[in-house]
C-alpha cells in the first residue's frame, strides 16, 4: 500500500510539472483552424508538432535508461526467433508482458494468421499495441521482431539479428516505458485535439524471407496487416473510412544499433518530419545530451537522398500511408551474418537514437 501511495504522489507531481512545461515559452499551443476541418483523414497533412523547449527536453531524456533497456528488454530478445520457433513465442510473450504492465493501459492484441511459405503453411503473429483505440488518428512506430531463418550451423551459432531488429524492438519498449506518464496523461485527456490523436506500436512477424526475398517470400506480417487494416472500418461503425486511413505517419525502424549510422531521406512527402529528427538531434547535441557523439558524424541528413528499400512499410505505402523509414544507408556491415550480435552493438548510439525518437514522439503527439 505504501508503494501505491508513493506512485500516486509521484504521478500527481509529474502531471503538475508537465503542465508547467506546457506553459513555458517554446511550447506553442495546437495549431488553430483545425476545428474548421471536416475530413479528419486529411488532418495528417497539415498536422504540426509542438516543439519541446530545453527544460522539457532535459526532463524527457532523464527518464530513459539505456542500461535498464539493455537488461530488461534487449537481452530477452537477442535469441533465435524465426516465425514459429520457440524463441518467437518467447519474444512475443515478453513484448506483450512489458506493454501490459505499464500505467498507460495499452490495448495489446495479437494478429495471428497463416500464410504459405517455401516450407509450407506457417503461422505468424503480429503484435499491435494501441494507446487509445477510440482515437481517430494514430502515429505508428513499427519494427519487425522475427529473426531471419538460418539452417543449423556446424559451429552451433544461431542468428539473433541484433540490429535486425532486436534493438528497434527494445527501443520501442523503452519508449513506452520511459514516456509512460506522458502517454497516460495523453490518454486521460478528453478534449480535442489530443483526444483525436494517439500512438500505436506495431511489432511485425515474418519480415524476413525464408529462402530468397520475393513478393511472396517476405513481409508476411505487414502484407497481412495492411490488407486487414484497409478493410476494417474506423472509427467503429464508420461506413467510408478504414483503419489504414487513421495512420497519420508510419515510422519504421530497422537495422539500428551499429556505430555511426547515417539515415538519408527516402520519401520527400515526409521530409518535413525527417527534418524534425534532424533538428532534435542538433538540439540534444547543443544541450550536451548525446553520448560519444561527433557533430561531424550526424545521424539524420536531410541533404542525403536515397531510393526506397523494400521493408515492412511497402504494403502500407502502396495504400497511400505516409512513410518515415529509419534504416541506415549503407546497411551495417554485419547485416545477415552471424556477427549481427550483441558484441557489435554500440550502446551510446542506441541511447542517443532512443532519446531523439522519444522527443520526436512527444512533439508529434503535441505533448510538449
From Swiss-Prot:
Zn(2+) binds at residues 164, 208, 336. It catalyses: N-terminal L-glutaminyl-[peptide] = N-terminal 5-oxo-L-prolyl-[peptide] + NH4(+). Its main location: secreted. CDD domains: M28_QC_like. GO terms for molecular function: glutaminyl-peptide cyclotransferase activity; zinc ion binding. Disulfide bonds join 143-169. It is found in: Secreted. It holds the Pfam family Peptidase_M28. Keywords: Acyltransferase, Disulfide bond, Glycoprotein, Metal-binding, Secreted, Signal, Transferase, Zinc. Its EC number is 2.3.2.5. Expressed by the venom gland. GO terms for cellular component: extracellular region. GO terms for biological process: peptidyl-pyroglutamic acid biosynthetic process, using glutaminyl-peptide cyclotransferase. It comes from the Eukaryota. Glycans are attached at residues 53, 292, 352. The active site is at 207 (proton acceptor), 254 (proton acceptor). Residues 1-33 form the signal peptide. Belongs to the glutaminyl-peptide cyclotransferase family. Responsible for the biosynthesis of pyroglutamyl peptides. Has a bias against acidic and tryptophan residues adjacent to the N-terminal glutaminyl residue and a lack of importance of chain length after the second residue. Also catalyzes N-terminal pyroglutamate formation. This is Glutaminyl-peptide cyclotransferase. It comes from Gloydius blomhoffii. The gene is QPCT.
Amino acid at each position: 500500500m505504501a508503494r501505491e501511495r508513493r506512485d500516486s504522489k509521484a504521478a500527481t507531481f509529474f502531471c503538475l510539472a508537465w503542465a508547467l512545461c506546457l506553459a513555458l515559452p517554446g511550447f506553442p499551443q495546437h495549431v488553430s483552424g483545425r476545428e474548421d476541418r471536416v475530413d479528419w483523414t486529411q488532418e495528417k497533412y497539415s498536422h504540426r508538432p509542438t516543439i519541446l523547449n530545453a527544460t522539457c527536453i532535459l526532463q524527457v531524456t532523464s527518464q530513459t535508461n539505456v542500461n535498464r533497456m539493455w537488461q530488461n528488454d534487449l537481452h530477452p530478445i537477442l535469441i533465435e526467433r524465426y516465425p514459429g520457433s520457440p524463441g518467437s513465442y518467447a519474444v512475443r510473450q515478453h513484448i506483450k508482458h512489458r506493454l501490459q504492465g505499464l500505467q498507460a493501459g495499452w490495448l495489446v492484441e495479437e494478429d495471428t494468421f497463416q500464410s504459405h511459405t517455401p516450407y509450407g503453411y506457417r503461422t505468424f503473429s503480429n503484435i499491435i499495441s494501441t494507446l487509445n483505440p477510440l482515437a481517430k488518428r494514430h502515429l505508428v512506430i513499427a519494427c519487425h521482431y522475427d529473426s531471419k531463418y538460418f539452417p543449423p550451423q556446424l559451429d552451433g551459432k544461431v542468428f539473433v539479428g541484433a540490429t535486425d531488429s532486436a534493438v528497434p524492438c527494445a527501443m520501442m519498449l523503452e519508449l513506452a516505458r520511459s514516456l509512460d506518464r506522458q502517454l497516460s496523461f495523453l490518454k486521460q485527456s478528453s478534449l480535442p485535439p489530443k483526444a483525436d490523436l494517439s500512438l500505436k506500436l506495431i511489432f511485425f512477424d515474418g519480415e524476413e524471407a525464408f529462402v530468397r526475398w520475393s513478393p511472396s517470400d517476405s513481409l508476411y506480417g505487414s502484407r497481412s496487416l495492411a490488407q486487414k487494416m484497409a478493410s476494417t472500418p474506423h472509427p467503429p461503425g464508420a461506413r467510408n473510412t478504414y483503419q489504414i486511413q487513421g495512420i497519420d505517419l508510419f515510422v519504421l525502424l530497422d537495422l539500428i544499433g551499429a556505430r555511426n549510422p547515417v539515415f538519408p531521406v527516402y520519401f520527400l512527402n515526409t521530409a518535413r518530419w525527417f527534418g524534425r529528427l534532424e533538428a532534435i538531434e542538433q538540439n540534444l547535441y547543443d544541450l550536451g545530451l548525446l553520448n560519444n557523439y561527433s557533430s561531424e558524424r550526424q545521424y539524420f541528413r536531410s541533404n542525403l537522398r536515397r531510393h526506397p528499400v523494400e521493408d515492412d512499410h511497402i504494403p502500407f505505402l502502396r495504400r497511400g500511408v505516409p512513410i518515415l523509414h529509419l534504416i541506415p544507408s549503407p546497411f551495417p556491415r554485419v547485416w545477415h551474418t552471424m556477427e549481427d550480435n550483441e558484441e557489435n552493438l554500440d550502446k551510446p548510439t542506441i541511447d542517443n537514437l532512443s532519446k531523439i525518437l522519444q522527443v520526436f514522439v512527444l512533439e508529434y503527439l503535441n505533448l510538449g
